[in-house]
Amino acid sequence: MTLSLHFDKGTIQLHGMAGKYMQHLDGISWDERTNSYRTPAANYRKLVTALCEKNISFQDHARKFSAETFVLKKNIRPRSFQSEAAEAWLSEKHGVVTLPTGAGKTILAVMLIAETGRPTLIHVPTIDLMRQWKEVLSEYFDTPIGLLGGGINDIQTITVATYDSALIHVTHQGNLFGLLVFDECHHLPGEQNQFTALGSIAPFRLGLTATPERADGKEQVLYELCGPLCYEVHIDELSGRTLAPYVVETIEVDMRPEEREQYEISRECYTDFLRKARISFQHPSGWAIFLRRTSESPEGRKAFKAYLLQKKLSQASGAKVDRLWELIQQHKGDRMLVFTQDNEMAYRIGNNFLLPVLTHHTKLPEREAFLKSFRSGEYPILVTSKVLNEGVDVPDANVGMIVSGSGSIREHVQRLGRILRARPGKQAILYELVSKDTGEYFTNQRRRKHRAYEGPVVLPDESGQNSAQIN
């Protein structure tokens, strides 16, 4: 009986004389429920390659896609680094490409989708990104572009899906696509998101991100699901050429006396508890231990409240709001994005200065109106918490102001990337407001070790010019 492969709910079932070949195949296990051998669908490429190399005859009933010819409606003239990235990825047709925001990741994907010639599913984290991808793909491809997400279920040979929607449908659609593209692929190792990759047989996989690093250290999971890092370019390497030249300026702000007094009292309460409980945040489980220990006693709960208060005082001091207003006055005529760590501070700034605020609570019609008005110049300033960290195209912004943020290097590189889309004569500047002599200051120092902060600043001159075979 000939060995046969079948797709079943995000896995590959092996029927026939599978047991005879088990010593030749890795990652295969016996499923007592169905009396068959089974492997995750993501192992399809490795499985088929092994069968071919061992000259084992098989029938492939798993794959429900075939080669496609995608006609481009307009020519692409790639930049040198895009050509290098394409060549690196095409050598194996799987892997992660790291390019800064604004460096043309979407255009690179268009090139590789056309070159690979397989039905393609593009994964994105948000509805906004899903729509932006469809606009670009429709501009280049002479084929309908499908959408999966936001209440839309339209599968085409090229389809854009949110990670959430792709996860829902992967168990029955995981054999329809030969190429998976993961935009903002640092999301992929998430507890749920990774199943969108595990449940698909697609042999060809492209990960795109500006910053593959994760706070939980799960980059290796990303590479296992998507392929190794095959090409990388950093922000500082493209500054003044593909990206606008930029400056990052950290401004240390003295807290108001009453805020400083509250901060010191709260921080002393919080750090005393850490010392008594012998908790170190240098330990990988330090934060989890802190949360557990603070829940076990009144003293612990008091320490946790003190921790939250000292953090809030440093991130959202009134002195920062005063300094922000000075910067806004200084940059009249510029397009500014103001970033905060939380919605409360974003709305506080918006209310104080009568500025539009974008958060995840903003309804879609209002959100689109704000972005349209920002692009037209009617609104020169937008305030946001985390919504604009990734995925929303705001090419006209040239000044970024980080009032508060997390310790994540990725978040800050993403925020820098929001203001770096090039245009003639553009000079970008990113301000980081940091409360002096607080924990926030030391967090900022750790972030600044990233090479985006260390790269040479490229300023424009007066003319505006810059100094196994699977088919």
Which residue stretches match the model-derived regions?
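Post-DEXD/H (motif II) to motif III coupling segment of the RecA-like Helicase ATP-binding lobe
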Residues: H186-V247, R256-E261, I265, D272
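Conserved segment of the helicase C-terminal RecA-like domain
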Residues: R418-R447
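Walker A/P-loop
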Residues: S91-T116
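Accessory DNA-engaging acidic/polar modules
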Residues: M1-E84
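Conserved helicase/translocase motor-coupling segment
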Residues: I279-R367
